[in-house]
């Protein structure tokens, strides 16, 4: 029951934001390609600039499954970092451990990736890490604990069930061994998230 409720909530959020947050939500959106609620099919009035920026910020947050406080901290770090703030923001979020567990194909959704980390199934350079927000460094190896490899979710993952069609070039993935190495810092153009990051910057700079 809880899983069904969570799936419906995710599908509703996906429709509201206009992006599929999970594979199941993608199928749901194919059947109902309009916003949620009784007025979902109606043509929407022109959104205000604030509403457009807010929605873009919410889209980015939802794709990484993070809280507002985490998003704000990441933005402040991105703002202090040399380069374009919006690109920095996405690149920093992508270096989170849960994001890379998802991108490597160890999990089906960001929520599952976070759960795998919290339950101490994931290791970085041979050390168990249970913080989804852990920042993975260049050259570090992400892998599944040997005692966890035999569990059904990881057997499914090792068979390639969740592997992306195009694995980002910043990851060297050996899915059969349930290993992935962050070979370098991600570039915004390579990160498979849907976001106009400049609108997110404008939201926080208001």
Curated annotation (Swiss-Prot):
InterPro entries associated with the record: Ribosomal_uS4 (IPR022801), Ribosomal_uS4_bac-type (IPR005709), Ribosomal_uS4_CS (IPR018079), Ribosomal_uS4_N (IPR001912), S4_RNA-bd (IPR002942), S4_RNA-bd_sf (IPR036986)
Pfam families for this protein: Ribosomal_S4, S4
Entry keyword annotation includes ATP-binding: no
CDD domains, per the entry: S4 (cd00165)
GO molecular function: rRNA binding; structural constituent of ribosome
Gene Ontology biological process terms from the UniProt entry: ribosomal small subunit biogenesis; translation
Residue ranges constituting the S4 RNA-binding domain according to the UniProt record: 95-160
GO cellular component: small ribosomal subunit
Keywords: Ribonucleoprotein, Ribosomal protein, RNA-binding, rRNA-binding
Region (Disordered): 28-48
Source superkingdom: Bacteria
Keyword Lyase among record annotations: no
PANTHER family assigned to the protein according to its UniProt record, in alphabetical order: 30S 40S RIBOSOMAL PROTEIN (PTHR11831), SMALL RIBOSOMAL SUBUNIT PROTEIN US4M (PTHR11831:SF4)
Subunit-structure text: Part of the 30S ribosomal subunit. Contacts protein S5. The interaction surface between S4 and S5 is involved in control of translational fidelity.
Reported function: One of the primary rRNA binding proteins, it binds directly to 16S rRNA where it nucleates assembly of the body of the 30S subunit. With S5 and S12 plays an important role in translational accuracy.
Family: Belongs to the universal ribosomal protein uS4 family.
The name this protein goes by in its record: Small ribosomal subunit protein uS4
Organism encoding this protein: Paenarthrobacter aurescens (strain TC1)
Record lineage: Bacteria, Bacillati, Actinomycetota, Actinomycetes, Micrococcales
């Amino acid at each position: 029951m809880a899983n069904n409720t969570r799936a419906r909530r995710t599908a509703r959020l996906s429709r509201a934001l206009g992006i599929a947050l999970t594979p199941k939500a993608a199928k749901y959106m194919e059947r109902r390609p309009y916003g949620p609620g009784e007025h979902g099919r109606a043509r929407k009035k022109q959104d205000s600039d604030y509403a457009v920026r807010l929605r873009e910020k919410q889209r980015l947050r939802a794709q990484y499954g993070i809280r507002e406080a985490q998003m704000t901290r990441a933005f402040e770090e991105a703002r202090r970092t040399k380069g374009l703030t919006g690109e920095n923001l996405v690149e920093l979020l992508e270096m989170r451990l849960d994001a890379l567990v998802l991108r490597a194909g160890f999990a089906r959704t960001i929520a599952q990736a976070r759960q795998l980390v919290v339950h101490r199934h994931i290791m970085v350079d041979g050390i168990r890490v249970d913080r989804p927000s852990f920042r993975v460094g260049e050259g570090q190896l992400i892998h599944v604990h040997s005692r966890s490899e035999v569990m059904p979710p990881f057997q499914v993952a090792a068979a390639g069930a969740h592997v992306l069609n195009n694995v980002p070039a910043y990851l060297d993935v050996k899915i059969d061994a349930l290993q992935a190495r962050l070979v370098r810092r991600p570039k915004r153009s390579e990160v498979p998230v849907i976001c106009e990051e400049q609108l997110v910057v404008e939201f926080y700079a208001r």
